């Protein structure tokens, strides 16, 4: 019996993960080629070694959310350091995302620190309900902050222009990633 090469194994794994997502997308009635390719790519770019919890999640939305989160630089602010030791592409090293602190916050910008956006004990990203998350992304106001305050570093004016479906997909992906405590070593 012929053995599969590593590239073929990766392609097979992506196909196995993406197939249920694409099937769910098709049954949702909102299927188009662009969305399918983003869902598929989303599963391809989940950081190596990161285990997603897909139980009771919409797999198509998780894939789309991964595509948006992992292609939009979210780790640059919400993971510190962004890359694992020896995995910094800016140092011409093969990219390896720091999954030990993946999206657990801790990047300091003057008086501001990026939030831990992994799920809390109840499975809510950053402790926010879906409605609170969408409102934060549209208005920049974190419901945990005093009324009138807006996030000063988070590019919410840009993310707020995304469709509701895109923002729900981000939320669904964040629900699927492992919960982590706040980054124990905040810094620039």
Regions found by a protein language model. Give the residues of each.
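Boundary of Sec targeting at the N-terminus
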Residues: 27-28
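Electrostatic cytochrome c docking/interface patches
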Residues: 38-70, 84
């Amino acid at each position: 019996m012929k053995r599969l090469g590593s590239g073929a194994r990766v392609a097979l794994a992506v196909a196995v993960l993406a197939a249920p997502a694409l099937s769910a997308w098709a049954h949702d009635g909102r299927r188009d080629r662009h969305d399918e390719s983003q869902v598929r790519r989303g599963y391809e770019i989940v950081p190596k070694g990161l285990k997603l919890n897909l139980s009771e999640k919409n797999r198509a939305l998780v894939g789309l959310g991964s595509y948006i989160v992992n292609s939009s630089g979210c780790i640059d602010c919400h993971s510190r350091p962004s890359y694992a030791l020896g995995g910094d592409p800016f140092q011409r090293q093969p990219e390896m995302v720091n999954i030990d602190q993946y999206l657990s916050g801790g990047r300091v910008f003057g008086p501001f620190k990026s939030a831990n956006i992994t799920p809390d004990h109840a499975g809510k990203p950053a402790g926010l309900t879906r409605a609170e998350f969408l409102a934060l992304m549209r208005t920049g106001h974190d419901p945990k902050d005093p009324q009138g305050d807006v996030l000063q570093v988070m590019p919410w004016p840009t993310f707020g222009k995304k469709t509701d479906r895109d923002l729900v997909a981000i939320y669904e992906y964040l629900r699927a990633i492992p919960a982590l405590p706040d980054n124990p070593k905040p810094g620039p």
